[in-house]
């Protein structure tokens, strides 16, 4: 699931039907569980991506430092001698490293978005309660 798909789903799920406020209040727990599950899945993807990043960083450090297996240099030659102080420049500008950093940032952004959704679901109950109270007031019950 992408962030855009998640946003569309949230927009649909958080709509409140003014005519069935009683059912909407019960729906909160289901929604909270649903988005908590999404958050857990994205957090697991984030942990995996961070682990992949560490492995890739080590591989790139060996590659640019001249310590990688000879087979790697046959398939992907690198003829420069890089100083230890310059290793980070080469590693941080490597396309694979940048792609993985973008993936990590995307997952972190998605998790922050889901945290906001979870807060909205919690406040949704309060909003529904206020709407019910307002309807009672309008009907002269309060």
Predicted features and spans:
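Charge-rich amphipathic alpha-helical interaction elements
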Residues: 1-142
């Amino acid at each position: 699931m992408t962030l855009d798909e998640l946003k569309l789903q949230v927009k649909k799920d958080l709509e409140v039907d003014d005519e069935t406020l009683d059912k909407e209040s019960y729906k909160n727990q289901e929604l909270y569980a649903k988005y908590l599950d999404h958050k857990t899945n994205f957090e697991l993807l984030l942990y995996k991506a961070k682990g992949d990043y560490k492995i890739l960083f080590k591989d790139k450090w060996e590659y640019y430092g001249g310590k990688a297996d000879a087979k790697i240099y046959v398939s992907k030659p690198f003829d420069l001698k890089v100083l230890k102080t310059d290793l980070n420049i080469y590693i941080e500008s490597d396309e694979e490293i940048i792609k993985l950093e973008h993936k990590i940032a995307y997952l972190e952004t998605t998790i922050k978005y889901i945290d906001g959704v979870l807060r909205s679901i919690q406040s949704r109950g309060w909003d529904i309660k206020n709407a019910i109270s307002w309807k009672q007031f309008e009907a002269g019950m309060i």
